[in-house]
Amino acid sequence: MDFLHSAAPEPHRGRTKQILSLHPEVRTLIGPSPTTFWYIAGLVGLQFAVARFVADRPVWLIVALAYTVGAFVSHGLFVMIHECAHRLVFRRRLPNILTGLVANLPLFVPGSFSFQKYHLKHHAHQGVYDLDADIPSLWEARLIGHSALGKALWLLLYPIFQGVRSFRVKAVPPLDTWTLTNVAIQIGVNVAVYMLWGPRSFAYLALALFFSIGLHPLGARWIQRHYLVGEGDQETFSYYGKLNLLTFNVGYHNEHHDFPSIAWNRLPRIRAVAPEFYEDLAAHMSWTRLLFKFLFDPKLSLYSRMTRTSAAGDGPEPWGSDAAVATEGATAV
């Protein structure tokens, strides 16, 4: 078994050029959204408040709250870290790095700065095995196989697989000052939660993290983005269901890849301005339905990804210098 292969360039640069040619007003949407910082502050405060609340609550309530509340908060914070990676909270690099570290505080596992480094490579080299850490490793795909149990375990342990996978990308140094700072802060926060509030609060934060990207409707978001679940060779998919209201429009993934320097609260306007470019693309309407399809359809596996041998089409980005951080110009981050 192997991934699917394409000799064509990744699909987004070409579409971006076409959209800007026909709809130059899209450029007015480019730029950060500083009000995002207050959403981050609210989510961080809420997650720690719930963690404190469950300190002396029964285990069943802790699990229930982690699944129904904590998972959405943790997922929202992941989306906010993603915004920081693209410098979409503030314009300058340092405030976005620091804001990403704040968003990481309740997330149990340090990953804010590492995500920024590897995610920008994903945009610049979509589908290139040695540069795109979003592509599962071959050993990972072989280990998980096609069984529902294997795929369920993979989703449940996704943070671990993602962390190990990143070492495959030799172009990105795994350790640096900011990454180590992120690790040190997170260890300190986790120890403080355990010492001050006890093991149940600690467990709540851990469960919220794993539910947010695992066996939960939100976990299907990791499948929705680039897994080939339909006919044809479309390799990026958007989600237009109602949960976008609770997940900061993260489902608008084609739109995001076409314009990675447009903030989350303006992504729906891309499709509204240029509907002819998106109406014919396959899209998902239900993360829950997608989750079950991925788990129980034996034709779907970690091999259901499109790869390419070179980052065809690399070069200056068509949407202009304001978006440079989302490209190979990401070396500035």
Regions found by a protein language model. Name each.
Residues 1-71, 105-204, 265-266, 271-333:
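Non-catalytic, topology-defining segments of multipass membrane proteins
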Residues 52, 90-91, 131, 234, ...:
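Short, function-defining helix-loop hinge/capping sites that tune catalysis or transport
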Residues 83-99, 131, 136:
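Aspartate-rich (DDxxD/NDxxD/DxxxD) Mg2+/diphosphate-binding motifs
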Residues 97, 101-105, 234-247:
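Membrane-cytosol interface motif
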